[in-house]
A protein has these predicted regions:
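Pocket-edge structural micro-motifs
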Residues: 3, 66, 79, 127, ...
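A generic structural signal for short, non-catalytic loop/turn and secondary-structure boundary residues
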Residues: 57, 70-73, 107, 118, ...
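Short loop->beta-strand "edge-of-pocket" segments that line small-molecule binding or catalytic clefts
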Residues: 1-7
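Tryptophan-centered motif/residue detector
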Residues: 25-26, 37-39, 104, 123, ...
Length: 180
């Protein structure tokens, strides 16, 4: 088993998924940006690039990395059974299905976990990146410019996000961002 040696959002998302499908994992290991891996012969890698390099180097190994590293390194991926019982592959369609199916407004600020969402086409280990800003910033002019940038990115960043192997925020969620 190859895992992140450093704390990471990728590890948090992966262990968040594992806690959602295994009571034993939840009890013994839990979720976090860094965890004590129970595998006896586990190997740590620094960053996604370190995990990808170790998985490619160690015959018969298995690990987890951000999707962009799977594509960039021509790595083999596996299908997973999602919450609806279907076996799905990781791709922009299954990631978007997980995002669209999530109840974004169930907590303030849309800060929810979207792992293991219901839906026939959902990839079960999907996460979202969030932008966190002060409600009452010290420099309001800088904050206004940052908000303008992200507004531009939401409206015009589809091509760039796809080039980086990320999924652009579905239109239905872009409308919801005004409520945050």
């Amino acid at each position: 088993v190859v895992h992140r040696a450093d704390g990471s959002g990728t590890t948090y998302n992966f262990t968040d998924y594992l806690t959602s499908v295994s009571k034993d994992w939840d009890t013994r290991v839990g979720r976090g940006a860094a965890v004590k891996w129970p595998a006896l012969n586990s190997v740590g890698g620094k960053g996604n690039e370190g995990v990808a390099a170790n998985v490619n180097r160690i015959r018969g190994s298995i690990g987890y990395v951000e999707y962009a590293y799977v594509k960039k390194n021509n790595m083999t991926f596996m299908q997973l059974q999602n919450k609806s019982g279907n076996y799905v592959s990781p791709d922009d369609i299954t990631f978007a299905a997980a995002a669209v199916g999530a109840d974004w407004f169930s907590v303030p600020g849309m800060g929810i976990s979207i792992v293991n969402q219901q839906g026939k086409d959902t990839w079960p280990i999907t996460t979202a990146s969030f932008i966190v800003m002060y409600k009452d910033p010290k420099d309001k002019d800088v904050s206004k410019e940052v908000i303008k940038f992200f507004d531009w990115a939401f409206k015009n960043g589809k091509k760039l996000s796809e080039e980086l192997d990320y999924v652009h925020l579905p239109e239905s969620l872009q409308i919801g961002r005004a409520h945050v």
